[in-house]
Structure formats: structure tokens, C-alpha cells
């Protein structure tokens, strides 16, 4: 699903906040999340700031490590 740039930018900020809050709830430092997920610290930092363009593979690694569910919703239902 491709979202308009403005909407996707907002979603990235929300996504980053979710990652940061869940990491905090698990009391993990960015370095620890990096080691457990195989995602570079720089990438985690960018995602948490709502920046960058993370690959789906990266998102899935983080969600799996943080025990978050990844749900895909059809654009028609938005």
C-alpha cells in the first residue's frame, strides 16, 4: 500500500513513537535492540525520529524483536 507523501510522513512519525515507547517499556537501549534485531543503531535512531524510509524487512525485524503485531489494511478501508 502506497500512501500519499504527507500521510506517509505522519505515519512514520507515529511508527517511530510506537517503536521508541515499546523499546522503553522493555527497558532496552537502542544498542540492545540493534543487537537483538540485527538492525543498525543509526537506522533505529532515524526510525524513532520518524525519518528515513525503512524497508519492510527492517520493520518486520523490529516488530518481531519488540513482540509487536504487524497488520496490513487495504487502502480501500482507510
Pin down the residues of each PLM region.
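Short basic helix-loop element that most often maps to the first helix and adjoining turn
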Residues: 17-32
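Conserved hydrophobic/aromatic packing and binding residues within compact polymer-binding modules
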Residues: 19, 33-34, 44-47
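DNA major-groove recognition helix of helix-turn-helix/homeodomain DNA-binding modules
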Residues: 55-73
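N-terminal flexible/basic segments that precede or flank functional cores
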Residues: 1-13, 65, 74-78
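Residues at secondary-structure transition points
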Residues: 10-14, 28, 50-57, 78
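Recognition helix of helix-turn-helix/homeodomain-like DNA-binding domains
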Residues: 38-53
Amino acid at each position: 500500500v502506497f500512501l500519499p507523501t504527507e500521510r506517509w510522513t505522519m505515519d512514520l512519525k507515529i511508527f517511530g513513537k510506537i517503536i521508541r515507547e515499546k523499546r522503553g517499556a522493555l527497558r532496552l537501549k537502542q544498542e540492545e535492540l540493534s543487537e537483538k534485531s540485527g538492525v543498525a543503531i543509526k537506522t533505529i535512531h532515524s526510525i524513532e525520529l520518524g525519518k528515513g524510509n525503512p524497508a519492510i524487512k527492517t520493520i518486520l525485524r523490529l516488530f518481531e524483536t519488540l513482540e509487536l503485531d504487524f497488520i496490513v489494511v487495504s487502502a480501500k478501508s482507510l
